[in-house]
Amino acid sequence: MNTQDLAKLRSIVPEMRRVRHIHFVGIGGAGMGGIAEVLANEGYQISGSDLAPNPVTQQLSQLGATIYFNHRPENVRDASVVVVSSAISADNPEIVAAHEARIPVIRRAEMLAELMRFRHGIAIAGTHGKTTTTAMVSSIYAEAGLDPTFVNGGLVKAAGVHARLGHSRYLIAEADESDASFLHLQPMVAIVTNIEADHMDTYHGDFENLKQTFINFLHNLPFYGRAVMCVDDPVIRELLPRVGRQITTYGFSDDADVRVEDYRQLGAQGHFRLVRQDKEILQVTLNAPGRHNALNAAAAVAVATEEGIDDQAILRALESFQGTGRRFDFLGEFPLAEVNGKPGSAMLIDDYGHHPTEVDATIKAARAGWPDKNLVMLFQPHRYTRTRDLYDDFANVLTQVDALLMLDVYPAGEAPIPGADSRSLCRTIRGRGKVDPILVSDPAQAAEMLASVLTGNDLVLVQGAGNIGKIARHLAEIKLAPQKTEEERHG
């Protein structure tokens, strides 16, 4: 951003007083990196630390940020404030050093709240669909020429970034309930896509506590703000009378203010009508598959309609929507002659979904778009606590595929829990008699084991939130073909 643009922005959004150098602990995470990127473009000096380089840290380095691939006390020297990821423990040496030096230490959401303070904030919350809905709202506002700032938890593929600094007063951001830090945000508009039991350790295992936290989040809206809520979700429907703000509902339900009708899916596109109160019916072509994405689009349209955005801009944005990274991400279609000698081909899809509801939605989208394909899933459970808490739900959902390969649980720092491991989950699924799971204990063998179950007319879903995305990219690079050893190559 040039000096003239920065001065124009300052007239809209005052800078943080006396803050010059902002240090991020855990800067490589998508949410942290996105905020750092916006602040770097606003002219702040950015530094940060993480354990290893990734595309987020590479992008920030190109913007002039100083990145350390270690955690040392000296990294926070001269920082005005330290921003910490929820994944970072209190005994991290940089956090300890910041406290000793009386440097303010704040959570990611507190910094996001500062970015939002002087802007028209639109926050997207909910157990599932936040990232895609944030991208859809951002795409519509950009198509309408409103040049929003956005901060997303996933890569917005059309922009090639997780976050972008716009020149207008609009800020569109994903709001994270995992550590309840979204309570720091004070948006003008808030979307809640759905509410399910997840991250229950934050809420002391009390679902009522989780529900009340969402109510408190919505009551951060000003009295003239608006809550946009999915009435199809039974928990949201239950909570509606407790929300003391203006509400727009959306969903497939007959009483939704923005109603999805006549949904059908052709390949990777959804086609449906959106019926709005006192507005023209929209005939939507959405470049994203699945009924769940139609709901995400309905939420985005509800917000855009409230803002008075032109219908044609809305329709163009949805039809050209490029999606987000690792959300039903098409990585290619590969001939099987080079994989296992069989005629035919296999499509490869990478998806971040790691909760049973998300996995179910991905499977349904795959079945609806490609009903004749042999559906093969390579799945990596994420966290032992989630596997334990949702064990039966995972077992039920994963029986819907034709072939299932399962990696070990990605621990995300958790200690193993007996009975909540992949071997136990495979045993339970096998006992239900619908699919015979294959346990992939060594990720290096994933390609070879995957090749053994391909039939010649396959759709391969690589599913999970841990490091399985790297495996998906590797499978795409080798075009699903297992790499032969020297002995195999030379007979």
Swiss-Prot record:
It holds the Pfam family Mur_ligase. It comes from the Bacteria. One of its GO terms (biological process) is cell division. Pathway: Cell wall biogenesis; peptidoglycan biosynthesis. One of its GO terms (molecular function) is UDP-N-acetylmuramate-L-alanine ligase activity. One of its GO terms (cellular component) is cytoplasm. It is found in: Cytoplasm. Keywords: ATP-binding, Cell cycle, Cell division, Cell shape, Cell wall biogenesis/degradation, Cytoplasm, Ligase, Nucleotide-binding, Peptidoglycan synthesis. ATP binds at G126, T127, H128, G129, K130, T131, T132. It is an enzyme of class 6 (ligase). InterPro entries: Mur-like_cat_sf (IPR036565), Mur_ligase_C (IPR004101), Mur_ligase_C_dom_sf (IPR036615), Mur_ligase_cen (IPR013221), Mur_ligase_N (IPR000713), MurCDEF_pg_biosynth (IPR050061), UDP-N-AcMur_Ala_ligase_MurC (IPR005758). Its EC number is 6.3.2.8. It catalyses: UDP-N-acetyl-alpha-D-muramate + L-alanine + ATP = UDP-N-acetyl-alpha-D-muramoyl-L-alanine + ADP + phosphate + H(+). Cell wall formation. Belongs to the MurCDEF family. This is UDP-N-acetylmuramate--L-alanine ligase. It comes from Klebsiella pneumoniae (strain 342).
